[in-house]
């Protein structure tokens, strides 16, 4: 257990210190200043109080006031002056730390997002990775306090350590027996605190998963786009019940945690009472017997309190820092998730490209079942291929493998007789313009959603909008192409219809102008006539480019060069529309005959 803690604490603390030094080294000046101020204030208060009390006692005892008042006034002025100065410096330092805390929070949010965007795609569909990502996000933010939170704990240990050394020197001279009393009580309280902190870590892991599930249902309830389904299917109660369930799970877990920690809190309270009683008895006895002055009594009481709370603060901050490092370590664990996909460095040559699947089989990570088996197909430059099949036949998986979102389990995929693993990822993916059925639009302007990182070409953009049938709708918007999509971050934004959203996604693919274009059922929300028009325009625009169409409605089949029919985890039929439709009791012919009545007039 101890070695396990060290594996978390030391790397995390080292990482935090290194990150702070690299990005905001001036933060350490603020911490050093706070340490000096804390020590100065502690020593001034303890020592000045002794002399102040002794001077007042001398006056009360019949001494000449004029001999003692100046010293008393000086002590008061020194205490007040140092206190005010310390308050001012601490205020300024805390403001600086708050600013840096926000900066580091944003820094790690961006770093985590970049990690998600760069990691292998398979990780983004893995529940364990998603849970770890949630732990990383929570662990690096409010659970640990991030860089500033952990550095606060670290420098509190340093500051209190310096203060403790100062008061130990005072106590060793005046009331030496106070040292074992304070230390023994501290050891006991440390034991109780550690046991309580272990429960915090234990319940954190349990709460992290519950919070992710609760967050999902809360998002679904607050997401405006779910409004139609919730109302039409009267699912509000079901959604609320699920959200309430996980909310109650959270409350019950916290209640269970606090109940388990309660006894350790009571043990600590009892120890504190015994410590204070023994300390006051010892100091009071020395004062009554004349061994120390009244000022010494005050100094001993103050020193004993400072010693105990200094030691307690050291132990408490060590425990808190250990706990915080345990939380923040979840970020390091997430950041350490390695990619399994090999990274090539070959550049993609210009010119014609031939795609070849050779005996490709694939099963998803953590699954024993193959979703594709023995896929063999060659797609030549400029060929238009239609991929058809029932839901779950593996059509989208086929595209994911081609785009190298996953690596094949067996076999290989070649582009121009070179295994796609040998190509640079960024170079390879430039070959493709893809519109998936679960495409994502962003709360940016319509123009930005289409162009993304591509260079802006207004003429090309207008032509693309016209080809996709979105130009007229775009020109009717208040700010035309600069109109923000959705109202999430802009009250003047527009809510596009499902069909308009799909046309926008198609525009994005067309605008990229890649040599291989893929449409993975992006027109599901359109009616058959509109779908056919989109496909027809799209096919004209694609021209000599390689194109792969996936659609249940078979609208693209007649104008495609070849058709691949997926069923039973493999390609069951392959050929032209005319060839496949003639196969008696064939999969394609049955699908075509079942659907022909919906669009035969439009595609004839």
Question: What are these model-derived regions, one by one?
Answer:
Residues 28-89, 169-200, 278-281, 285, ...:
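Transmembrane helix-loop-helix hairpins at lipid-water interfaces of multipass membrane proteins
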Residues 1-42, 61-75, 93, 97, ...:
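Membrane-integrated ABC transporters
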């Amino acid at each position: 257990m101890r070695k396990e803690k060290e594996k978390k604490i030391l790397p995390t603390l080292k990482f935090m210190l290194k990150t702070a030094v690299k990005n905001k080294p001036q933060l350490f000046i603020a911490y050093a200043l706070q340490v000096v101020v804390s020590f100065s204030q502690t020593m001034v208060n303890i020592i000045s109080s002794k002399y102040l009390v002794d001077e007042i006692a001398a006056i009360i005892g019949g001494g000449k006031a004029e001999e003692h008042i100046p010293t008393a006034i000086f002590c008061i002025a020194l205490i007040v002056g140092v206190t005010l100065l310390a308050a001012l410096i601490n205020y300024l330092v805390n403001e600086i730390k708050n600013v840096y805390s926000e900066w580091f929070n944003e820094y790690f949010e961006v770093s985590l997002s970049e990690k998600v965007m760069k990691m292998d795609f398979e990780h983004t569909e893995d529940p364990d990775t998603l849970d770890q990502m949630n732990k990383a996000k929570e662990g690096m933010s409010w659970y640990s306090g991030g860089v500033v939170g952990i550095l606060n704990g670290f420098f509190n240990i340093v500051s209190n350590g310096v203060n403790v050394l100062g008061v130990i020197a005072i106590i060793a001279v005046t009331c030496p027996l106070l040292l074992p009393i304070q230390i023994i009580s501290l050891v006991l309280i440390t034991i109780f605190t550690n046991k309580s902190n272990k429960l915090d870590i234990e319940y954190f892991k349990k709460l992290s998963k519950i919070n992710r599930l609760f967050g999902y249902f809360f998002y679904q309830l607050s997401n405006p786009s779910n409004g139609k389904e919730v109302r039409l299917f009267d699912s509000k109660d079901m959604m609320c019940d699920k959200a309430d369930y996980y909310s109650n799970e959270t409350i019950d877990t916290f209640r269970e945690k606090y109940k388990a920690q309660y006894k350790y809190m009571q043990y600590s309270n009892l120890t504190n009472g015994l410590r204070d009683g023994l300390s006051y008895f010892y100091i009071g006895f020395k004062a009554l017997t004349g061994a120390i002055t009244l000022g010494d009594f005050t100094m001993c009481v103050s020193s004993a309190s400072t010693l105990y709370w200094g030691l307690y603060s050291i132990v408490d901050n060590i425990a808190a820092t250990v706990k915080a490092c345990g939380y923040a370590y979840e970020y390091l664990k997430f950041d350490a998730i390695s990619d399994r996909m090999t990274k090539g460095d070959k550049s993609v040559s210009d010119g014609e490209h031939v795609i070849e699947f050779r005996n490709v089989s694939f099963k998803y990570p953590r699954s024993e079942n193959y979703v594709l088996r023995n896929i063999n197909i060659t797609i030549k430059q400029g060929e238009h291929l239609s991929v058809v099949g029932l839901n779950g036949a593996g059509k989208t998986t086929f595209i994911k493998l081609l785009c190298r979102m996953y690596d094949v389990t067996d076999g290989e995929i070649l582009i121009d007789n070179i295994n796609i693993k040998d190509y640079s990822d960024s170079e390879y993916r430039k070959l493709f313009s893809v519109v998936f059925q679960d495409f994502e639009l962003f709360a940016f302007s319509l123009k930005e959603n289409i162009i993304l990182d591509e260079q802006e070409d207004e003429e090309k953009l207008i032509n693309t909008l016209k080809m996709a049938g979105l130009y007229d709708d775009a020109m009717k918007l208040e700010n035309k192409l600069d109109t923000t999509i959705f109202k999430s971050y802009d009250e003047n934004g527009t809510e596009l219809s499902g069909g308009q959203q799909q046309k926008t996604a198609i525009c994005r693919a067309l605008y990229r102008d890649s040599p291989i274009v893929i449409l993975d059922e992006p027109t599901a929300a359109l009616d058959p006539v509109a779908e056919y028009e989109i496909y027809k325009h799209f096919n004209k625009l694609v021209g000599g480019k390689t194109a792969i169409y996936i659609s249940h409605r078979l609208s693209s089949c007649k104008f495609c060069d070849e058709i691949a029919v997926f069923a039973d985890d493999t390609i069951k039929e392959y050929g032209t529309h005319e060839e496949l439709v003639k196969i008696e009791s064939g999969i394609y012919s049955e699908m075509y005959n079942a659907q022909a009545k919906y669009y035969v007039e439009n595609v004839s």
